[in-house]
Each structure stands twice: as structure tokens, then as C-alpha cells.
Amino acid sequence: MDKEKIISQMTLEEKAEMLTGKDFWSTKDFPNLGIRSLFLSDGPHGLRKQAAASDHLGLNASIPATCFPTASVMACSWDEELGERIGEALGEEAAALNVDVLLGPGLNIKRNPLCGRNFEYFSEDPYLAGKMAAAYVRGIQSKGVAACVKHFAANNREYRRMTSDSVIDERTLREIYLRGFEIAVKEGGAKCVMSAYNKVNGEFANENPHLLKEILREDWGFNGVVVTDWGGCNDRVDGLKCGNELEMPACKYAVEDVITAVEEGRIEESLLEESIRRLLELSEFTARKQVRAYDERAHHALAREAAEKSAVLLENDGILPLKAGTRVALVGDFAFLPRYQGAGSSVVNPTFLSTAEKVFASLRPSLSSSVSKPVSDSSAEILSSPDSVSSSDSALSSVSMSSSDSVSPSVSMSSSDSALSSDLVSSSLSAPPSLSAPPLSPAPSVPLSVSSFRKKEQETFPPCLAGCGEGRSYSLFRGIGRIFRSGGHRPCRHEDSAKSNRAVQSVGRGRK
């Protein structure tokens, strides 16, 4: 590819068009110039490419893919080699669906335990997060797919993430909040970085010269592409000045703003050409990927291996290893409908799903389970169900809020898992409760579950900022206020449409 020749043939309008999305997931192509479209797709622990047209968010409507353990689980393995193997599998699946840029891994530091996307991030340890992220990046990019580390930087909470300001002194910023990104860039060789929604020390991350120019480009030597988080562009011209090459998704105002800025002398056309040069280099790299089918069962087996190697056994009171013939009671909704991932932009529609129920069924006759349906998580109900527990030697407790709160796949999956059964690994086995114990009073409603936290936040915070699963979709659309200002987003369950529209109008950061 003769990049300089291509750039010399481009008009100012074409240059401006190349620096913003064509639709929700892809960049604009220019067949007459030999420039192809790039397709970007979630996500950190599994591909989330939607099944229909590309001009919508597509949550819960994605093509089935392997759901690997989330980053929060994988960090418990401390296994870089395993992380790189998962990265390779992610790269293979992305290439099979002709995805050029995989939006992950995420490695923001876990500063607040209530951050709704903590499951997407590795650790509160910047060194561990960086090493695991670098391994993922190497694996993904070995398959000709670019990895996009996110969210740069200090995006450590979801509450009001579009307008919040992370005020951090320089040493803390570099040693804690940026160290993981530095490792992913220098050791992993990440081709892309996604800028965050929030401000850092008073300036939005997507137009922050200290972050994007002085640290990322000059100090770390990053020569790849910086892309905005979806709807995270505050000022397109200022973003370009700082080296933010690509605004996503498409925005009709961006092209006009860039052209006007060049014509008025507020930005040099050569700066656009520098950004285009990086995008062409990214296109050249991803053009090498091999679009071919992958082995779904092998990838699911790898996901199970990763889950086993990441499991942490907190205590074993003589229960493990299980002996042949042991009868096990499966207690709790998650044994049958597990929460194996979070919600939002990273949700994966899995090709296969291994549940405790299926695993125990596949291990018969060595082991046998005495419960064929979930027993409520309430201790009182467990004790009042002697038929479910009294005949068992052990109880596997899968505590949850309720099965209705679990994330379930949106399309049918294969239920056959017997061929993939291996050694049972569990960190939650315990002896059955004594049935002679005195009756327990029902547990008080305290904010220990997600649902309780949601109710508390709904009462404490303004409408639509409750942080529920639907609210995350709301937060994203709120960031693209200039596109959905009329209220074209889906409101969360904590509000009605009228409140939603007013909230969008009051917090949207888009141009009027």
C-alpha cells in the first residue's frame, strides 16, 4: 500500500470522512482509492458482533461466540501463557467474522467496588493488570486482528462517567492508573487505544494533551490509533490536535466541524493526514488476517480450562476431593442458570454453557446429584427442604439474587456438554446444614445484593443514574446526546420516557 500516494489523492472532505465512523461499528471505505472499511467489535472476554445491520448498538442480538471467563476471573490465574492462548482464540473468532479491531482488553484499576464494569477489568494491581492485558494483546494480534486496550484513562466508576473528573496527582496517575496501559502498549504492542468518557484533571480524556500526546505518544512511543469510546467525543477538533484519530460511531457534525476548522486555520490539514496515515497502517495490518472457521468445542474447552485454573479455593473442610458415589445437593439458582458474565456492551451470546447441573449430570455414575431443580438461596427454605438436602453427603452452594436477575443467552445453545467433562473443580462445596438446627428467621433486606443496591441508588440518585443493566445502555446513549437528543434511546426500568428525555437533554454533551 502506497500510503502517501493515497493521501495525496484524497480531498479535504474525504480526509474528514475517514476520521469518523460510517455507522455504529465500521469506518468509511473509499473503493476508488483502495481504502477498505474497518469493522470494530466488542468485547473483552468474547466477541459481540451483532447478527443484523451494523447501524445499531445490538445488545443481546449478537452472533454466538465463546464466552471466556471475564478479566476479573482470569486475573486470579496469574497465568500470562493462558491469557495469551485466550487472546489467540479471541483473535481467531474475530477473524472468522471479519472483525478488524477487537475492543478489549479492559484494564482500568478497580478503585470502587460498586463500579458496574469491574468484571471487565483485571485487578486493583496495575502490574498484574498490565501483564495479563499484554498477554491478551499479543494473542489477539497474532491472528491479524488489532486489540484496543481501554478505557484510557482513570475510568474507574460508571456513575456519571460522562461528566466525572478524575483528579489525580502525577505520581499516582502514572504508578497506579497508567502503569497497566504502559505495559500493554510497550510489552503487548497494542495497535489501538480507546480514550475514556471522563475527564482527567479537568480535561476530557479524548482531548487531553497530557494523556494522549505527552504520555501515550511521546513517553511510551505509541504509534497506533486512538479511538473514542462510543459517543465519547466532546470536541472533535481538539481531539484531533491531541492525536485522537477516530471518532466512533458516525456523527454528521464531525465532518463539517473538521472541514470548517481547516478552512478557518484552526487546524492544519497535515494533522488530518497524519491521522489517516495511522489508520491506513492499521488497515494494512488487519488485512493479513485469515478469515476461516474455528473450532467452537475446542474454544469452549479452553474457556473451561481457564475457569478451572482461575478458581480460588478459600477453604476445604474435608470435603474435597469428592469420593465416588458421593451424593451432592445443588443449592441456589446459579447452579442452573449461572451469572457467568456481566451486562452491557460486553455481554456474549455463548456457543455453549457449562452449568453445575450439567457438569454433575455428566459425571454420573461416579457422582450423583440429589436435586433436579433449584433450591432457594434463603437459609430458612434450605433448612425446610429435608428431601432436598438430608440425603446428600455434600451441598454445592451457588448463591445468587434470583434466577430472573441472571444473564441468560438470547438464542438457543447446545446443551450437550458431556464430551467436555473433566475433573470437577469447585470453590463452593460445603457440608450440608444440620437439619436439627433451630429454625432461622428470614434474612432482613439489607443492601448486600445487586438488587438491593439498585433500589438504594434509585432512591438516592437522580433518575436514570441507578446503574442497573439497562442503565448502562442509557449511559451510552446519553453520551451521544447530539444524535439521540429527542429521546431515541431505550429508558431503563427506573424511569419513564418523559424523565428519560429530560435527563438526556440535561446531561448530553453533544453539539446543539
Where are these regions (language model features)?
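Long, intrinsically disordered low-complexity tandem-repeat segments
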Residues: 368-372, 376-379, 384-430, 434-436, ...
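Glycoside hydrolase catalytic-domain context in secreted enzymes
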Residues: 1-367, 447-512
